[in-house]
Amino acid sequence: MIKDIIKNAEEKMQKTVTVLKSELGTMKAGRANPSMLDKIQIDYYGSMCPLSQAANISSPEPRVLMITPWEKQLLKEIEKAILKSDLGLNPSNDGSIIRLVIPELTEETRKDLVKKVKKTGEESKVAIRSIRRDANDKIKALKKDGDLSEDQVKKGEDDVQKKTDAIIKEIDKIIVDKEKEILAI
């Protein structure tokens, strides 16, 4: 029972880390990265679908993304979706592909981006702590029901804390790495 609670908490914590990595991947750091476009949805014959499912996205140069749609008639729709997004990129449509040139980041933009990264990291840590609290509450509930002894509860809470500490350490490393990437000129 207690192992299931800990395993469940660990899975939720790992999902939180995966979401963090995904969110940080969409933040532009002066380099072209196809994951920057992950959140862009296009109107594909009346239904919304991710850009990556309607086009090939590649990075032929460090600061250029090239979008090759599966169907040429999607060019205008893709261009419109990129302009509507909060990425601040200007697509260049040549009739068969769309090029996105990622502008150099100014010092001020870099600092703002670092603040965003730290805020996102902090939100992830809060989510991790919430998962820890839920797991500990479930363990304590088992004690109230008489299913666990005080020692088992203490060991369970210690195990949850160890998992929490490891995940928070991983988040800190991810944040520091992203900050270095942003601040590298």
UniProtKB/Swiss-Prot annotation:
InterPro entries per UniProt: Ribosome_recyc_fac, Ribosome_recyc_fac_dom, RRF_sf
UniProtKB keywords: Cytoplasm, Protein biosynthesis
Coiled coil feature spans: none
Domain of life of the native organism: Bacteria
Localization (cell): Cytoplasm
Entry annotated with the keyword Cytoplasm: yes
SUPFAM superfamilies: Ribosome recycling factor, RRF
Cellular component terms per the entry's GO annotation: cytoplasm
Membrane-spanning ranges: none
GO MF assignments: ribosomal large subunit binding
Main localization, broad class: cytoplasm
Example GO BP: translational termination
Functional note: Responsible for the release of ribosomes from messenger RNA at the termination of protein biosynthesis. May increase the efficiency of translation by recycling ribosomes from one round of translation to another.
Family: Belongs to the RRF family.
Listed name of the protein: Ribosome-recycling factor
